[in-house]
């Protein structure tokens, strides 16, 4: 069936519609509202987004905080040029970290970030990741101090389709105003549309719940299998506090701010008897594994052949998704992380 054929999720996007910078002020970003029951499309801006939220809906937000995950170093302490890139993914066992390192690398290699701080390669993993440990003058760093190192020397991990180096504005614009728990290496991008004023109004006027899904680097990976049902999606760390779990269990109508919040809710609500607050989320939502527990979604416009485009199709159908994306391109909506948004009701 064509809805499970990977090629059905391809589309052409003119390069000029890839947003390299955010719209400021945030409220001026464009918003496409699709109402499924009436099949109507409304073109507006984020200044009016809360006017469309159903009054009785529970609004779910992902409060993960993006790490400055890109480090640049050199293979020799005395070299001033830092041309080796280390992309931090997540902590592994104890104080080691899973990373990607550009260029040739072998076990035992050291990458220096300054005269004192360096990383040592411990293992080359089959999936292209490298297991490393961080040191300060030969003293191993714990997780807390590694995060301090990343904050001091790291760069914001802008997505690969943004063809520029990170700038000072990215430190706050590629971070939601309600970001709280550090651990993501990509922003939950629908969240970026909310200013502090808009957030305060949302929290005052709507029932809401926070959860934390630490978005992983796998979020940018294309699906590669010809039949999308055979794709193995990446795993991400999910934390849902008991208070939020209780609110989710009792709520009938749910609106998620972003696909990460939606995937988290769907994963949690399908568990038989959840008795913990932390999980490993690996749910892949598509037309053969449709959305069951979320009614509405605020999201950005996603990459061709991505699992997120398949998630949107699982919510409104493949043909309707393609139709709306075609309209968005014709109307010059801006796509991807710093782009405009879409509200599905």
Curated annotation (Swiss-Prot):
Q: Name one GO cellular component term.
A: cytoplasm
Q: Which GO terms describe its molecular function?
A: S-adenosylmethionine:tRNA ribosyltransferase-isomerase activity
Q: Pfam families, from UniProt?
A: Queuosine_synth
Annotated metabolic or biological route of this protein: tRNA modification; tRNA-queuosine biosynthesis
The alphabetized list of GO BP terms reads:
queuosine biosynthetic process; tRNA wobble guanine modification
Superkingdom per UniProt: Bacteria
Summarize subunit and interaction data from the UniProt record for this chain.
Monomer.
Protein name (Swiss-Prot/TrEMBL): S-adenosylmethionine:tRNA ribosyltransferase-isomerase
Q: Which organism is it from?
A: Helicobacter pylori (strain J99 / ATCC 700824) (Campylobacter pylori J99)
């Amino acid at each position: 069936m064509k809805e499970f054929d990977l090629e059905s999720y391809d589309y052409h996007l003119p390069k000029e519609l890839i947003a390299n910078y955010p719209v400021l002020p945030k409220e001026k970003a464009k918003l496409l509202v699709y109402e499924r029951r009436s099949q109507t499309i409304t073109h507006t801006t984020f200044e009016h987004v809360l006017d469309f939220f159903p009054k009785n809906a529970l609004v779910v937000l992902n409060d993960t905080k993006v790490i400055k995950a890109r480090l640049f170093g050199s293979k020799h302490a005395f070299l001033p040029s830092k041309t080796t890139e280390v992309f931090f993914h997540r902590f592994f066992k104890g104080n080691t970290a899973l990373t990607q390192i550009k260029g040739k690398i072998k076990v035992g290699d050291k990458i220096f970030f300054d005269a004192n701080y360096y990383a040592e390669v411990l293992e080359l993993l089959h999936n292209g990741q490298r297991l490393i440990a961080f040191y300060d003058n030969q003293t191993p760093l714990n997780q807390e101090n590694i995060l301090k190192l990343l904050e001091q020397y790291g760069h914001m991990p802008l997505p690969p389709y943004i063809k520029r180096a990170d700038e000072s504005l990215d430190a706050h614009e590629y971070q939601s105003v309600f970001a709280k728990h550090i651990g993501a290496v990509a922003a939950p991008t629908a969240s970026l549309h909310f200013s502090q004023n808009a957030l305060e109004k949302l929290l005052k006027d709507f029932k809401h719940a926070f959860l934390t899904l630490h978005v992983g680097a796998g979020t940018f990976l294309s699906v590669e299998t010809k039949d999308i049902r055979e794709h193995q999606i990446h795993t991400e760390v999910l934390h849902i506090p008991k208070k939020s779990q209780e609110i989710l269990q009792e709520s009938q109508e749910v609106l998620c701010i972003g696909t990460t919040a939606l995937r988290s809710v769907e994963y949690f609500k399908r568990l038989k008897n959840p008795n913990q607050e932390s999980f490993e989320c690996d749910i892949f939502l598509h037309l053969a594994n449709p959305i069951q527990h979320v009614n509405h979604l605020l999201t950005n416009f996603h990459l061709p052949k991505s699992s997120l485009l398949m998630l949107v199709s699982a919510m409104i159908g493949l043909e309707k998704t393609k139709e709306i994306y075609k309209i968005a391109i014709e109307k010059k909506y801006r796509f991807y992380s710093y782009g405009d948004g879409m509200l599905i009701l």
